[in-house]
A protein has these predicted regions:
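Rossmann-like NAD(P)-binding element
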Residues: 53-81, 87
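NAD(P)-dependent Rossmann-like dehydrogenase/reductase catalytic/cofactor-binding core
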Residues: 199-269
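Internal alpha-helical scaffold of NAD(P)-dependent oxidoreductase catalytic cores
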Residues: 99, 103-107, 123-161, 171-211, ...
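ADP-ribose/adenylate-binding Rossmann-like module
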Residues: 82-96
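Rossmann-fold dehydrogenase core element
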Residues: 87-90, 100-115
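NAD(P)+-binding Rossmann beta1-loop-alpha1 motif at the extreme N-terminus of oxidoreductases
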Residues: 1-57, 185-186
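A short helix->loop->beta-strand "cap" motif at the edges of active sites that frequently abuts
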Residues: 26-27, 82-86, 106
């Protein structure tokens, strides 16, 4: 089976090098194409570097890792070259299956990885159009399992799923950046040490919850004893943070809606 990746941006590059390093795909079965060929020359040692149409004609699974505004042009470019039974995989939640079908009507999946794929712990969202059978789903899931866990959702839930896994590293980093900055104003502990302490505690808390099957409330109850210091802090968080979380999702989901509208307009041109 031959795997192809069109686009050598952050996600395309990550997938290429992860697929190469897992040892399951030979160099001659891994293809990469990019609009600027010079940018992808560094991959010549691990993959076949070629143009979009050659990649589409040779590969059984074709990942398209380009911006929404470029998607229609790329799909139009490769439409006549795709194999009849190839699986097209897009990495953009704003592009719907209905949009894609206007250009090319093939088996299609949408995949949304997370930044944590870099350490093989991605929570990767995937959804499929009605042409994809169980065998293709199994093949793609096995391929994506090399970068973490695969979570299948219906297309209408991909947006919120993306917020929870793909956007979440940025949300989490922002939240704990605020906490560390606030802590710095109350202590002589160096900022670098504060960050390390918080990161290690955050990571260990997540592992503890997963390994012991604890809920958030379980952890809060165990740490925030009645009348204690931690309880004072958790009260503030539960009183004040819900409005910030609601506004965060309102803003991001609205931006996602507007992005989808722009993408739809580009497919109607």
């Amino acid at each position: 089976m031959k795997i192809g990746i069109i686009g050598y941006g952050s996600m395309g590059k990550m997938l290429l090098w992860k697929f190469s390093s897992n040892g399951k795909i030979a160099k001659e079965d891994l293809y990469i194409a990019n609009r600027t060929r010079e940018k992808v020359l560094e991959a010549e040692g691990i993959a076949v570097v070629c143009d979009n149409c050659t990649l589409a004609s040779e590969c059984d699974i074709v990942f398209v890792c380009v911006r929404p505004v470029d998607m229609k042009a790329v799909l139009s470019d490769i439409a006549a070259s795709l194999k009849a039974d190839s699986l097209l995989v897009t990495l953009n939640g704003s592009i719907t299956f209905d949009m894609i079908r206007k250009v090319v009507d093939v088996k299609t999946a949408k995949v949304i990885p997370s930044l944590t794929a870099e350490i093989d712990r991605s929570q990767t969202i995937v959804c499929y159009n009605d042409k994809v059978g169980s065998a293709d789903k199994t093949v793609l899931s096995e391929l994506l399992s090399s970068i973490g866990e695969v979570i299948e959702l219906p297309e209408n839930e991909v947006g919120m799923g993306s917020e929870l896994v793909s956007c979440m590293p940025g949300f989490i980093a922002s939240i704990f950046d605020v906490i560390c900055n606030s802590a710095e104003g109350h202590t002589e502990i160096p900022k670098e040490q504060i960050v390390k302490m918080v990161l290690n505690t955050m990571s260990a808390t997540g592992d503890l919850m997963l390994q012991k099957d604890l809920s958030f409330n379980d952890v809060v109850t165990r740490v925030a004893t009645k009348g204690g210091i931690t309880e004072e802090g958790t009260k503030v968080i539960y009183d004040m943070f819900p409005s910030a979380a609601d506004e965060m999702f309102n803003k991001t989901l609205e931006k996602r809606r507007l992005t989808a509208e722009k993408a739809a307009a580009s497919f109607n041109e």
